[in-house]
Swiss-Prot record:
Mg(2+) 1 binds at E256, D300. Contains an N-terminal zinc-binding domain, a central core domain that contains the primase activity, and a C-terminal DnaB-binding domain. The gene is dnaG. Transmembrane segments: none annotated. Monomer. Interacts with DnaB. It comes from Rickettsia felis (strain ATCC VR-1525 / URRWXCal2) (Rickettsia azadi). RNA polymerase that catalyzes the synthesis of short RNA molecules used as primers for DNA polymerase during DNA replication. GO terms for molecular function: DNA binding; DNA-directed RNA polymerase activity; zinc ion binding. Its cofactor is Zn(2+); Mg(2+). Its EC number is 2.7.7.101. It is an enzyme of class 2 (transferase). GO terms for cellular component: cytoplasm; DNA-directed RNA polymerase complex; primosome complex. This is DNA primase.
Amino acid sequence: MRVAPEFYELLRNRINISDVVRQKVALTRKSGNYVGLCPFHQEKTPSFTVSDSKRFFYCFGCKAAGDVIKFTSNISGLSYNESAIKLATDYGIEIPKLTAKQKEFYEESDEILNILELANKFFRTQLTPEILNYLHERGITEETVKEFSIGFAPKNNKFEKFFHDKNIDIIKLGKAGLIGKRENGEIYNLFSNRITIPIRNIYNKIVGFGGRVLGEGLPKYLNSPETTVFQKSETLYGEHKAISSSYKKNHSILVEGYFDVIALHQAGFSEAVASLGTSVTENHLHKLWRAGDEIILCLDGDNAGIKASIRTINLALPLINSEKKISFIRLPNGLDPDDAVNKNGADFFAKLIDKRISLSEMIWHIEYSGKSFKTAEEKANLEKNLKDYCSKISDSNLKASYYRFFKEQIWQNLVTKQKKATTKNSNLAPIISSHGYSELEMLEHAFCALLVKFPIILEEKDIRDFILNLNFNNKSLEEFRNWYLNEIIDNNVEASEITAIVEKTSFFDIFLLLSKTDNLFLDISFNKNNIRLDLLWQWLHKKYYLINLQQEYSITINSTDNHDFEKVLLYKKEILKIANELQVLNESFINHTIT
């Protein structure tokens, strides 16, 4: 009984794969998934994983992988189609009958798939030593040539004769996307004089071909036209091999070309796929996200690659959230993924993966790097572009995080640099305390001391968000802040256990400094016997605001000969107001007055 492919998707959505697997395998819950002993090979330690969210199983031992239908097929020995029917019967799901039009459609699809399989067998027989030598020069081994069924379409009439002998006419070859028609009406083999690379769908069926011209002809690369079985917006080259690897690694690598995919697979990066001569689509992204939470784009670093990155960013922004992510590998100038792995090796490419940047970082790189922001108009345009990106994000929490990230980047790369330049030009030296830190760095120490001595203060969301998003001048303190929040505070580590944990890290010296009974940063007493956290926080927050206000005041005074006196007066008024408020707090709380 023939069923539509849409019915397979219905089964995947309606039936939890863990329910089916549990009938054959004892499963244990682990990190949101399930693990158990693989039913397809002998093992003593569980390496078989099942994910309901990804609707997928994978064995790290024997590499068995697939969906709920594939699992049933592997267990029962039935075909994929027969397994789908069995599952529908077992779970009481109605099997929709095909209409006459659907039957005609699937009969035509089957015929096209058969023709494409025959074409690939023919192309494989046409490989010559010259072609193999060309492939070897590109770093492709004979084993890889076989694995990817790479072939060759000759110029002569062997192709036409091959199908004529099998009683397959021109009309059928046209429906399969194998022939073209010249302006003079002449019919020809579409892939004539090209290396052929079969394109397979998720079910490992050949649905089309890619062709690379032998020599310098144009176009260099050619894809099959869209047919009944081949839609470029749905298909990714290499997906039949990559999906199981993407599930295992929880990410996929999206590149531009066939040979990029082939080179990466040969080097061990079997999670690589490529879009087929077209822009990345929503369907592509959703297909990859079903297999792994992160899609790593690795596009050429030229102008075309940057434009492709921008298109993909704009497409992805409404779709991403804290779980479904996009990141980018930035290739060295002049390299594509094929070159990167063949010329520099797998270890080099693995390091590029490790150094990948987030989508937000890529946006900042595109909008900021190599550009001038000397004028108000240039800065305003930067802010507008960044806000436009943020506005496309549907996830409200992520949108807020992006706004904060870009605000921090603007502060670090524009405001802070301008402040430093102004300070240098006006001979204004930073205020240094007896501890050897600037006033701002002492405040940073004080904020970190709060984490260590009074973590209860973080129960106030505004305070936690402020400390979490604070951009430290002292990067060692910033690293300590991030580590302490993630590893100690968020894990609710008992106070008696903290020292033993920190002692094993590189942060121990900082921790000891911050843990002193009477911390002397800014001459503030952190002694718990007389502490008032509300007043302490007010003092620190106002002091931080005052220092930044004074720096902005200095910029205004020194940035031009013609001062904006109204603005200067406003700064003076605000500085005096905050200084007076701090004085009141000093008298109420601080042991040693600061002036």
